[in-house]
Amino acid sequence: MNRLNELSFIDLILEDGFAEIKGMKGANSYLTDLPEIYQGDASELRSVCNDIHIRTQKTEFSLRYDGRIYRVTVIYHEWSGTSFVIRQTPENILPFTDVPLSTPLRSSITRPGATGLCLIAGEMGSGKTTTAASVLRQRIEITGSLGVSIEDPIETLLHGRHGNGRCLQLEVGQNESYSTATKKALRMGASCLLLGEIRDGQTAHEVLKASLTMFVVSTIHGSSVYDAIDRYVMFCEEINHNAKQNVANTLYIIAHQTMTSVRRGDVVAGRNISINAFNLVNCTQNAAIKSKIMQGNYRALQDEFNGIEYTL
């Protein structure tokens, strides 16, 4: 029986009666039927997912199966029953050399004493978390610091030693919130942090608080860097109505990531990542950028970004 861990893909969609795969290298289309030779392994994986769902009642969780970590989302439909959307995570943390950032942005990430938020935006399935994990590991490795990754659910392989530093992982769940996990990270003396994906006001609030004193990496859904800042502020203001000033003072790096399929003829041969990123602190336009964020004039930041000059 051929194993799913032999494949490179984005999502596997399993339901009683069908199995489809999205973004598979070597496929003729972005979404296609799972090849028959992998159906047996997919059936076993679906059974494992169903057991976890029934036992825990979770509708989102991660699991290690056949040496790979998968993030699972459970969907229930009255007519078709239970479906599982299974995101494949990388076998290893992406080497930082493979993250397409400019030299000033690379220096910004490893800059000693740097604090604030490195916010990575993009569409769903664009590889934001993969990039965020690579950024955090590079920061830990170069600065020799203690880092903590707080995820919901865990989908990276960050736990362990990296260079002269170390990363610990905490999973948000029934007995752990982003708030309690962040407090633990502070008590541990961590100086850098990965806080999952910003999907609500509470998570945004924890990210904002942590970025006042720490180097923080997080992700957010957004169609551009401007949209990402707007959404982040919107979430922060659900709890703190005067959040714009704190965001302006703590937003360190803003990045927008896209993923496109690389085709050779009719076959998907791979995936290409592109990142548009800016350091908002170590640049001559810092004061103007802060002012526009405090005013909520995010689209006007295009003027500063187009002519940005770094002072690193």
Identify what each model region corresponds to:
Residues 1-66, 71-312:
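Short, flexible helix-loop junctions that flank or precede catalytic/ligand sites
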